[in-house]
Amino acid sequence: MRSYLDFEKPVAELEAKVEELRALASAGDGVTITDEVQRLETKAREALLALYANLTPWQKTLVARHPQRPHFADFAKGLFEDFTPLAGDRKFGEDEAIIGGFARFRGEAVCVLGHEKGSTTETRIRHNFGMARPEGYRKAVRIMELADRFGIPLISLVDTAGAYPGIGAEERGQAEAIARSTDACLALGAPNVALVIGEGGSGGAIAIATANKVLMMEHAIYSVISPEGAASILWRDTAKAQEAATNMKITAQDLLKFGIIDAIVKEPPGGAHRDPEATIGAAGDAIADALSQLAGLDGPAVRKARRDKFLAIGRSL
C-alpha cells in the first residue's frame, strides 16, 4: 500500500478516486468507466509532476525520509553482483548501521560501503536507523584500506540522519572514528564515488563521502545538521524546521550550484519510492559515468584530484 506525505494530499485524493472506479468496474455491474479512469489518471499524473517540480527544501527533506524510499539494501541488490559483506571493526564489534564489502559492479570488482536504515521495525532497530557507532566507521576504514590495497574503486551510498550520539558511542571515541574515516576516505589511492541516496547528515555522512565524485539523488538532502536541529539551536523552536531547511541550502540543486556535489541523479516523477527499479537503474548509470571519468588515474593522481576538489570547496564558499 502506497504511503503519502501530507503535502501529497491532492494527488492521494485523485489516485483514491481512480482505485474506487477500478473497484466498481471489477464488480461487473456493466458500468463502463474507462474514459473517466483515464481522465483522472492523467489529472493525477499532471498534479504529481507539478507538485514535484516545485518542492520546497522542507518537502524534499520529507521525501528523502519517505518510509518507502529505497535504502542501501535495495540499491545493493539492484546494482551489484556477488556482494560479499564484511563484518566487524577488529577492535570492538559489529555495527550494522554501515554495511560494506566486496562486489562486482557491471563486471568490475569494487568495494561497497553504505548506511542501512532498515525498512521494518525489526530491521530499523537492528540497523539503528542508519546511525552508525564508532565500530561502524572503523569497519568502513577497514574496507577503504582493502580497496586501497587491491586498487579497486570504492562506491559509497550515503543515507543517514547522522552518527549515533549515544553515551556508549561517545565513550568509544565517536568523533575520533569519524575523523579517521574521513581521513582514510580522503587518502584513498583508489578512485571513489559517493552517492547520497536519502539523507546526508553531518559528519556521519561525510565520513564515507569525501570522494572524487559526489553525486546526489534529485530529492536527497545533504547538510551539517538536520533542519530540526538547526531550528532548535537558532530559534529554540523545532517548529521553525521549514525555515531552517530553506536557509541551510540542503537540496541537491543548491549544492550543485555551490560546487559541493558533482552531479544530480534524476528520480522518477513522484520520487524514488514510486519507482525504485528506475531509480536504482539511473543511479547505476550515474555511478558508472563517474567511475569512467576517473579511469586511468594512478594513486597519486586520484589523491591529488580529490584533495584539489575539497580544497576548492573551502576556497569558494
UniProtKB/Swiss-Prot annotation:
Keywords: ATP-binding, Cytoplasm, Fatty acid biosynthesis, Fatty acid metabolism, Lipid biosynthesis, Lipid metabolism, Nucleotide-binding, Transferase. One of its GO terms (cellular component) is acetyl-CoA carboxylase complex. Residues 39-293 form the CoA carboxyltransferase C-terminal domain. GO terms for biological process: fatty acid biosynthetic process; malonyl-CoA biosynthetic process. It is an enzyme of class 2 (transferase). Acetyl-CoA carboxylase is a heterohexamer composed of biotin carboxyl carrier protein (AccB), biotin carboxylase (AccC) and two subunits each of ACCase subunit alpha (AccA) and ACCase subunit beta (AccD). Belongs to the AccA family. This is Acetyl-coenzyme A carboxylase carboxyl transferase subunit alpha. It comes from Xanthobacter autotrophicus (strain ATCC BAA-1158 / Py2).
